[in-house]
Amino acid sequence: MLSLAHYLVLGAVLFAISIVGIFLNRKNVIVLLMAIELMLLAVNMNFVAFSHYLGDLAGQVFVFFILTVAAAESAIGLAILVVLFRNLDTINVDDLDSLKG
């Protein structure tokens, strides 16, 4: 049976992969959004692992709230990305530095 340490190590590895993904790829907005979502999922896995280990359901309930916020964040982020691509014909982060009204 897997212990708490196994889940925490897996969560830490996923979190580290997402941080590396953010630092290595700062050009593409889609990859940045995917790395942020992976980071949130790693944190959620740690919440569920601690909740199961302690026998408390509060962590699992908190994960549902985090997942709903993450879904809204990704939907809004992708909607903004579609508008930016239609207006600027690029999803490169370096080209998104002008603020026009």
Curated annotation (Swiss-Prot):
The keyword Translocase applies. One of its GO terms (molecular function) is quinone binding. It comes from the Bacteria. Coiled coil: none annotated. It is found in: Cell inner membrane. Pfam families: Oxidored_q2. InterPro entries: NADH_UbQ_OxRdtase_chain4L/K (IPR001133), NUOK/Mnh_C1-like (IPR039428). Keywords: Cell inner membrane, Cell membrane, Membrane, NAD, Quinone, Translocase, Transmembrane, Transmembrane helix, Transport, Ubiquinone. Its EC number is 7.1.1.-. GO terms for cellular component: NADH dehydrogenase complex; plasma membrane. NDH-1 shuttles electrons from NADH, via FMN and iron-sulfur (Fe-S) centers, to quinones in the respiratory chain. The immediate electron acceptor for the enzyme in this species is believed to be ubiquinone. Couples the redox reaction to proton translocation (for every two electrons transferred, four hydrogen ions are translocated across the cytoplasmic membrane), and thus conserves the redox energy in a proton gradient. Belongs to the complex I subunit 4L family. HAMAP family: NDH1_NuoK. This is NADH-quinone oxidoreductase subunit K. It comes from Ralstonia nicotianae (strain ATCC BAA-1114 / GMI1000).
